From Swiss-Prot:
One term of GO molecular function: tryptophan synthase activity
Role this protein plays: The beta subunit is responsible for the synthesis of L-tryptophan from indole and L-serine.
Cofactor(s) required for function per UniProt: pyridoxal 5'-phosphate
Family matches, as NCBIfam families: trpB
Pathway: Amino-acid biosynthesis; L-tryptophan biosynthesis; L-tryptophan from chorismate: step 5/5
Record gene name: trpB1
Organism: Archaeoglobus fulgidus (strain ATCC 49558 / DSM 4304 / JCM 9628 / NBRC 100126 / VC-16)
EC number: 4.2.1.20
Protein name: Tryptophan synthase beta chain 1
Stored Gene3D superfamilies: 3.40.50.1100
Subunit description: Tetramer of two alpha and two beta chains.
UniProt KW keywords: Amino-acid biosynthesis, Aromatic amino acid biosynthesis, Lyase, Pyridoxal phosphate, Tryptophan biosynthesis
């Protein structure tokens, strides 16, 4: 198999093929260059690595188990393993990245972090990491998400963060990102923008991917120990794409199908979805060239998903590259399919997944119909479903 990692280093090339880059106002070039130099310096620093490993183990709860879902496997007639990122402190994979970036900010001498959040998971994880490391935190949240994720808003405030609801635009994640970028322009001398996914201008997609790659590194060792070799496929949900990139990246050079599941919402034909790789086109937003849901003039379209964390009109540039080159496959699951998978996993395994993760479970259930009994699927269970209880209760009533 072609050595994909050589082509996906990011680094000073700033791009993944034609995707990525640094499409930002001139005023943001200095902080981005400062961040790139700091990351290049500290990522291999022994003290930085030791402290990161310590916090991931003793604070976040790594390594997470690779759980053989015995009941679900029996029901579907295929072996299904779940990478249990839902068991991390905070209930999702987001803490892998926030601890890494908050620690980097600390090593850079920054006093404050800002972040955007959709479902609230990244905001909570940022507030946790900031509290842990003694940093001031402000979280920007689209007003629509602010209303439907009130419990996470309370959590962030309890953890000491200031939460700002963004009323502009479509009042969702993309608008929260815009506000965070505006803040950073004015405050970068003492503030680090702790971006939550593999999106944004270089070097953010590379930094976030590297901090999330611990998922795939662990899963690779664990599946070899459990099955004696590689799985047939790895499945993960894709919004911005950080949990998927985290588990995919260490497997890029292996003979394994890598499948990203986008939010199909009410169906692609309806126009009410968040599937930018499936139905989008190339464009520029938030400092990067990637695939976006946009009209002919390049204006971003409104998105929809039952899952707030997948409700973003674009996707990380590395995913765009992996789609273009054919290394990864990207599919969709609609709201109803995700809700059915949410119920199925809860009843069969006693595990309540996040609605984001339920999209990946739903596609694994679809795939199982075409597979053999000894085939092996690994699903990244990126988060737990506590935050989604009210939404699911209303939808299933």
């Amino acid at each position: 198999m072609r050595c994909w990692l050589e082509n996906l280093s990011g680094g000073r090339k700033m791009k993944f093929g034609e995707f990525g880059g640094r499409f930002v106002p001139e005023v943001l070039i200095p902080p981005l260059e400062e961040l790139e130099k700091a990351y290049d310096r500290f990522k291999d620093d022994e003290e930085f690595k030791a402290r990161l490993e310590y916090y991931l183990k003793s604070y976040a709860g790594r390594p997470t188990p690779l759980y053989f879902a015995e009941n679900l496997s029996r029901e579907l007639g295929v072996k299904i393993y779940l990478k249990r990122e839902d068991l991390l402190h905070g209930g999702a994979h987001k803490i892998n990245n926030t601890i890494g970036q908050a620690l980097l900010a600390k090593f850079m001498g920054k006093k404050r972090v800002i972040a955007e959040t959709g479902a609230g998971q990244h905001g909570v994880a940022t507030a946790m990491a900031a509290a842990l490391l003694g940093l001031e935190a402000e979280i920007y949240m689209g007003a629509e998400d602010y209303e439907r994720q009130k419990m996470n808003v309370f959590r962030m405030e309890l953890l000491g963060a200031k939460v700002t609801a963004v009323e502009s635009g479509s009042r969702t994640l993309k608008d929260a990102i815009n506000e965070a970028l505006r803040d950073w322009v004015e405050s970068f001398e003492h503030t680090h923008y702790l971006i939550g996914s593999v999106v944004g201008p270089h070097p953010f997609p590379t930094i976030v991917r590297d901090f999330q790659a611990v998922i795939g590194k662990e899963a690779r060792r664990q599946i070899i120990e459990a099955e004696g070799g590689m799985p047939d496929a790895i499945i993960a949900c894709v919004g911005g794409g950080s949990n998927a990139m985290g588990i995919f990246h260490p497997f890029l050079n292996d003979d394994v199908r890598l499948i990203g599941v986008e939010a199909g919402g009410e169906g692609i034909e309806s126009g009410r979805h968040s599937a930018s790789l499936t139905a989008g086109s190339k464009g520029v937003l938030h400092g990067m060239l990637s695939y976006f849901l946009q009209d002919e003039e390049g204006m971003m379209l409104d998105t929809h998903s039952v899952s707030a964390g997948l409700d973003y009109p674009g996707v990380g540039p590395e995913h765009a590259y992996l789609k273009e080159t054919g290394r990864c496959e990207y599919v969709t699951v609609n709201d109803e399919e995700a809700l059915r998978a949410f119920k199925t996993l809860s009843k069969l395994e006693g595990i309540i997944p996040a609605l984001e993760s339920a999209h990946a479970i739903a596609y694994a259930m679809k795939m199982a119909e075409e597979m053999q009994r000894d085939d092996v699927l690994v699903v990244n269970l990126s988060g737990r479903g506590d935050k989604d209880m009210d939404i699911v209760r209303r939808r299933l009533a």
